[in-house]
């Protein structure tokens, strides 16, 4: 996005919240199923004295994918190397990373769905056979070279599982989906961060921040910092519900965690397109925002909260969105939603889906 939003779940440069990240699995709050499974896999790998199988984290930004990757390396007692898909532009970039890894090291690739397809082809034998196949030279003088690699663990993160190719997905032995946090979990995180900041906060103050944090710890930490700024200037001795509510209201973050851009998104569909359906490209053009930003940052929370519905024909506002905006839904919109729900029910009646079956609509 062109302007940094307060409620962006992407990390900011020099973000002070980086220093608040937990260092061990037992200190990590939330994602209980993921933590429990990771603990078992890590203990098993250590007992066998082998590299942990490759891990793929799937979920919206800000839920702890990078933090969990760092914790995994520490729990395994190995080195941690980090990069991202768009940064690996040439085969030489990937070769330099892989050849510098030691036995059982963890290599973390964020946004792996943005990896160049040519680079992805080189990654396949590296993940499966721990070998690097490179072509040296050009034309008739070109020759293939195989380089043996240390047995490493690739930990990848993506917000868009549907953009990963099937061969790449199949090479990850441990797929883990991270979900939005509950308000109770976020309250605990806010209180913990406040203690680390040496700031006094009441239970209702922590609750007020947590319920507006969009289910995302990174956003909760950012909101806490801004509320601390207000409390300091207002000379409040303690952050209670009144202080938190006043600060967040002035920042235009409402009680459900929606900011002006979220409301623009909902109002656009409601007023311009009468509740939808409307295509994502049309929404992106009308909001002057990249499609990826809308799909990765704005829509996941709106979908999770039941404000919108994705259909084959486009996005549709649901009843909760109309109520939140204080608007009346057109009668045609209600019948369209019922039809879309019926179609979705029929589509899903054939069987259950797994993590690998999911794709972005």
UniProtKB/Swiss-Prot annotation:
Residues 182-252 are annotated as: Small ATPAse domain (RuvB-S). Belongs to the RuvB family. ATP binds at residues 20-21, 62, 65-67, 128-130, 171, 181, 218. SUPFAM superfamilies: P-loop containing nucleoside triphosphate hydrolases (SSF52540), Winged helix' DNA-binding domain (SSF46785). DNA binds at residues 291, 310, 315. Pfam families: AAA_lid_4, RuvB_C, RuvB_N. HAMAP family: DNA_HJ_migration_RuvB. This is Holliday junction branch migration complex subunit RuvB. Its main location: cytoplasm. Its EC number is 3.6.4.-. Residues 1-181 are annotated as: Large ATPase domain (RuvB-L). PANTHER family: HOLLIDAY JUNCTION BRANCH MIGRATION COMPLEX SUBUNIT RUVB, PTHR42848. SMART domains: AAA. It is an enzyme of class 3 (hydrolase). It catalyses: ATP + H2O = ADP + phosphate + H(+). Homohexamer. Forms an RuvA(8)-RuvB(12)-Holliday junction (HJ) complex. HJ DNA is sandwiched between 2 RuvA tetramers; dsDNA enters through RuvA and exits via RuvB. An RuvB hexamer assembles on each DNA strand where it exits the tetramer. Each RuvB hexamer is contacted by two RuvA subunits (via domain III) on 2 adjacent RuvB subunits; this complex drives branch migration. In the full resolvosome a probable DNA-RuvA(4)-RuvB(12)-RuvC(2) complex forms which resolves the HJ. Has 3 domains, the large (RuvB-L) and small ATPase (RuvB-S) domains and the C-terminal head (RuvB-H) domain. The head domain binds DNA, while the ATPase domains jointly bind ATP, ADP or are empty depending on the state of the subunit in the translocation cycle. During a single DNA translocation step the structure of each domain remains the same, but their relative positions change. The keyword Hydrolase applies. One of its GO terms (molecular function) is ATP binding. It comes from the Bacteria. Keywords: ATP-binding, Cytoplasm, DNA damage, DNA recombination, DNA repair, DNA-binding, Hydrolase, Nucleotide-binding. Residues 255-361 are annotated as: Head domain (RuvB-H). InterPro entries: AAA+_ATPase, AAA_lid_4, DNA_helicase_Holl-junc_RuvB, P-loop_NTPase, RuvB-like_N, RuvB_C, WH-like_DNA-bd_sf, WH_DNA-bd_sf. GO terms for cellular component: cytoplasm; Holliday junction resolvase complex. It comes from Bartonella quintana (strain Toulouse) (Rochalimaea quintana). Mg(2+) binds at residue 66. The gene is ruvB.
């Amino acid at each position: 996005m062109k302007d940094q939003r307060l409620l962006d779940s992407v990390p900011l440069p020099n973000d002070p919240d980086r220093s608040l990240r937990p260092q061990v699995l037992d200190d990590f709050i939330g994602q209980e199923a993921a933590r429990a499974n990771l603990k078992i896999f890590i203990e098993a790998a250590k007992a066998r004295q082998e590299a942990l199988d490759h891990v793929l984290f799937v979920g919206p930004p800000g839920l702890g994918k990078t933090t969990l990757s760092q914790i995994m390396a520490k729990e395994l007692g190995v080195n941690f190397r980090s990069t991202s898909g768009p940064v690996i532009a040439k085969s030489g970039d990937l070769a330099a990373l892989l050849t510098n890894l030691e036995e059982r090291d963890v290599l973390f690739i964020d946004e792996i769905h943005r990896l160049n397809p040519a680079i992805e082809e080189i990654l396949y034998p590296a993940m499966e056979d721990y070998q690097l196949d490179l072509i040296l030279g050009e034309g008739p003088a070109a020759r293939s070279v195989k380089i043996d690699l240390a047995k490493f663990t690739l930990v990848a993160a993506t917000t868009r599982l549907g953009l990963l190719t099937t061969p790449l997905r199949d090479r990850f032995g441990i797929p883990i989906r991270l979900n939005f946090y509950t308000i109770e979990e976020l309250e605990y995180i806010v209180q913990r961060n406040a203690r680390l900041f040496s700031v006094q906060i009441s239970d209702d103050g922590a609750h007020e921040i947590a319920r507006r944090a969009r289910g995302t710890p990174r956003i909760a930490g950012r909101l806490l910092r801004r509320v601390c700024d207000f409390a300091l200037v207002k000379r409040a001795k303690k952050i209670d519900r009144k202080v938190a509510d006043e600060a967040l209201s002035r920042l235009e973050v409402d009680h459900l965690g929606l900011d002006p851009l979220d409301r623009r998104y909902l109002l656009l569909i409601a007023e311009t397109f009468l509740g939808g359906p409307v295509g994502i490209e049309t929404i992106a053009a009308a909001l002057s925002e990249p499609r990826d930003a809308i799909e990765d940052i704005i829509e996941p929370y709106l979908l999770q909260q039941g404000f919108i519905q994705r259909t084959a024909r486009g996005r549709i506002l649901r009843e909760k969105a109309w109520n939140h905006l204080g608007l009346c839904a057109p009668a045609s919109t209600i019948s369209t939603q019922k039809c879309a729900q019926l179609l979705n029910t029929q589509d899903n009646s054939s069987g259950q889906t797994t993590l690998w079956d999911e794709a972005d609509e």
